[in-house]
């Protein structure tokens, strides 16, 4: 267990690479000026109840020594988080079914490129500005030898929020959510690099981007791929 009950502000980084850590608790930590990196394949609980600001990246991983997803944490919530200066990444947590960032308004990117096929909920009701990309992709689990049977998420039916988004300077990429019924209301988006929607087999309705202007970045040209 990692627990710091009195720490309120950290001017540097937190870096933990440890396969024995099961519980993480920073009760009073509100501001981290640097980055946060946890790779903890035994993780069961991850609590930052008053954290509001991370200056650089916030990265939570569960890769084990076989380089596969691990950990038994089912629910992830950082309830007071409003700003991440770098990229917010949550990947390779094998049992994760829910993640919520209920007050997050601005981040340098959202990287959920290997979330579990059983993930049921992603809540981002207040997000407005993403200064990089939004990547949400369900795991393609390793198939048996000699076959290719992709495993896609067939339980997540809707994203919680994302209808306040105005700026995405990179791309939106959403892939392998075959039960998704409806996309967020993206009518407020004015700036967007590109958008890719792949293997969303049950989505209905109309994709509306009435105010969006596709703007190229140094790494990627404007693109709409459905």
Question: What positions do the PLM features span?
Answer:
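Concave beta-strand-loop units of leucine-rich repeat
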Residues: 1-96, 100-226
């Amino acid at each position: 267990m990692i627990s710091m009950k009195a720490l309120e502000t950290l001017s540097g980084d937190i870096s933990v690479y440890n396969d024995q850590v099961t519980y993480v608790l920073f009760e009073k930590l509100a501001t981290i000026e640097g980055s946060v990196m946890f790779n903890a394949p035994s993780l069961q609980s991850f609590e930052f109840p008053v954290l509001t600001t991370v200056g650089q990246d916030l990265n939570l991983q569960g890769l084990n020594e076989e380089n596969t997803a691990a950990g038994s944490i089912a629910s992830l919530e950082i309830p007071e988080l409003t700003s991440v200066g770098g990229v917010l990444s949550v990947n390779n947590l094998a049992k994760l079914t829910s993640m919520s960032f209920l007050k997050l308004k601005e981040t340098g990117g959202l990287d959920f490129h290997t979330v579990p096929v059983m993930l049921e909920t992603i809540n981002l009701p207040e997000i407005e500005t993403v200064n990089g990309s939004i990547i949400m992709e369900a795991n393609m689990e390793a198939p048996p030898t000699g076959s290719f049977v992709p495993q896609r998420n067939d339980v997540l039916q809707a994203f919680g929020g994302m209808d306040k988004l105005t700026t995405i300077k990179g791309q939106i990429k959403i892939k392998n959510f075959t039960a998704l019924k409806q996309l967020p209301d993206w009518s407020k988006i004015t700036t967007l690099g590109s958008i890719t929607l792949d293997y969303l087999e049950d989505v209905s309705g109309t994709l509306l981007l009435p105010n969006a202007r596709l703007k190229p970045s140094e790494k990627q040209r404007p693109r709409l791929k459905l």
